[in-house]
Amino acid sequence: MGSSSFLVLMVSLVLVTLVAVEGVKEGIEKAGVCPADNVRCFKSDPPQCHTDQDCLGERKCCYLHCGFKCVIPVKELEEGGNKDEDVSRPYPEPGWEAKCPGSSSTRCPQK
């Protein structure tokens, strides 16, 4: 095998490797989930991104407010809700209890 054949083989291997690595990069999804979008759109905005890799830093490519944009993701919810914020709890914070009007006690007298 001559040196020119060896050079062609090496260049081909490098190109195939670069293309394969680039394909893998595009499939990588950044951590977190896209924030909820409750906006009703009459017209979509042009996309600012197509994949998470189009966005800088921790930002993800999400459909938000009528178009794809790079936004800061929210934490993923664990099964049963997020430990930091349980929206299913009827009270504003753990340990909160209703107080009787004009009393510091949590027990109200029965009528």
Curated annotation (Swiss-Prot):
Q: Which SUPFAM superfamilies match?
A: Elafin-like (SSF57256)
Q: Where in the cell is it found?
A: Secreted
List the GO molecular function terms.
serine-type endopeptidase inhibitor activity
Say where the protein is mainly found: secreted
Q: Name one GO biological process term.
A: antibacterial humoral response
Annotated signal peptide = 1-23
| Biased composition, class Polar residues, residue ranges | 102-111
Tissues showing expression: Highly expressed in prostate, skin, lung and esophagus. Weakly expressed in skeletal muscle, epididymis, kidney, trachea, salivary gland, testis and seminal vesicle.
| Disulfide bond residue pairs | 34-62, 41-66, 49-61, 55-70
InterPro entries assigned: Elafin-like_sf (IPR036645), WAP_dom (IPR008197)
Its cellular-component GO annotations read:
extracellular space
What is the protein name for this chain?
A: WAP four-disulfide core domain protein 12
Q: Which organism is it from?
A: Homo sapiens (Human)
